């Protein structure tokens, strides 16, 4: 591991020490709590939508969340290790076969729905008679 990678790993450990990042993937519906400063007031703003892309690049990792607001599509890119992100909560797991869901930009209504990923069923081993 070279020096830059080592420094990036230390920075990731420092930034993620006080908060836990859940594992999520494209297709999942997430609620991202964003710290917003308005004048002297600081508050947390929730942004809920579908993760359409995830970019894993160490300290430069990011993800794009898309939602429909007042009939208009809104996308927001978040840096995974940004101090502006207060929390990430996974509301629903999506079952998709693509890493990037940019095709959802062209779709609306029922065609833009994503199937829910159901937890795997445990098969009980029955002894043969």
From Swiss-Prot:
A Gene Ontology molecular function term of the record: structural constituent of ribosome
Q: Where is it found, in Gene Ontology cellular component terms? A: cytosolic large ribosomal subunit
Q: Which InterPro entries match?
A: Ribosomal_bL19 (IPR001857), Ribosomal_bL19_CS (IPR018257), Ribosomal_bL19_sf (IPR038657), Translation_prot_SH3-like_sf (IPR008991)
Which biological processes are named by the entry's GO terms?
Answer: translation
Q: Keywords of this protein's UniProt record, alphabetized? A: Ribonucleoprotein, Ribosomal protein
**Pfam families named among the record's database cross-references:** Ribosomal_L19 (PF01245)
Protein family (similarity comment): Belongs to the bacterial ribosomal protein bL19 family.
Q: What is its biological role? A: This protein is located at the 30S-50S ribosomal subunit interface and may play a role in the structure and function of the aminoacyl-tRNA binding site.
Q: What is this protein called?
A: Large ribosomal subunit protein bL19
């Amino acid at each position: 591991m070279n020096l830059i990678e080592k420094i990036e790993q230390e920075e990731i450990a420092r930034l993620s020490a006080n908060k836990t990042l859940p594992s999520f993937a494209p297709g999942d519906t997430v609620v991202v709590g964003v710290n917003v400063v308005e004048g002297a007031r600081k508050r947390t703003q929730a942004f809920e939508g579908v993760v359409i892309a995830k970019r894993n690049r160490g300290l430069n990792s990011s993800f794009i969340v898309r939602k429909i607001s007042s009939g208009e599509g809104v996308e927001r890119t978040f840096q995974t290790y940004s101090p502006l992100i207060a929390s990430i909560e996974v509301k629903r797991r999506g079952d998709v076969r693509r890493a990037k869901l940019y095709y959802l930009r062209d779709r609306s209504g029922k065609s833009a729905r994503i199937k829910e990923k159901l937890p795997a069923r445990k098969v009980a081993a029955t002894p043969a008679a």
